[in-house]
Amino acid sequence: HYVEGSKTFSFEVAEQLDWQVPDQLIVPVGSGAMLNAICKGFEELQTVSLLDDVSNMHMIAAQPHGCAPIVDAFKKNNKEVIPVEHPDTVAKSLAIGDPGDGRYVLKRLAQYNGFAEECNNKEILDAILLLAQTEGIFTEPAGGVSISVLQKMVEQGKIDKNDRIVCYVT
C-alpha cells in the first residue's frame, strides 16, 4: 500500500504544475520506495494522457552522507547497492543502510537521465534553516537533504536554476 499511496505525490505535483512535466525532481531516499512510487505515478498520468512524455524529466536521488549506499553505487556505476553497516546521519528517517529498493532506484535513475548525490550533516541543517527562513517551512532532516542537494547541484551547474524543479520535502 505504501507505493500506491506514495504515487499521489506525483499526482499532486502534476496538478500544481498545471499538468506540465517537471524538468528535475529531487527525492530524499532511504529505502528507495518513494522515488519508485513517484516515477510510477508520473508514468500512470502519461498513460491516461494527463501528462505528455515524462521520459525527459530527470530524477535525482538525494541521500545523507553517512548513509548513502545508492549514491555510492551510482557514482561507481554499480548495478547492485552495497549496504552501509552503521548508518550515521542526522537524517534518521533516511538511515536505511540496506535499501530494499536500491537496485530499482538505480534503474529509475538510468531511465530518467538522473543521478544521485549526497550531502553532509552541516549542509542538511543549513538547508533546514534556509527553508524555514525563506519559505516558512519547517521540515525534518530528510527534507533538508533534498534542499541541500538542490543547492549543491545548482552551484555545480548540474541543474539550471531556471528549470521547473520539484524538491520533495518530507
Per-segment meaning from a language model:
Residues 3, 29-38, 67-70, 143-150:
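Short glycine/serine/threonine-rich phosphate/pyrophosphate-binding segments
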Residues 19-21, 50-56, 158-162:
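Short helix-terminating capping/connector loops at secondary-structure junctions
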Residues 24, 136, 164-166:
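Residue-level preference for the first positions of well-ordered beta-strands
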Residues 27-30, 60-63, 167-170:
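Short beta-strand segments
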Residues 82-85, 145-170:
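Phosphate-binding loop/pocket of nucleotide- and phosphate-handling active sites
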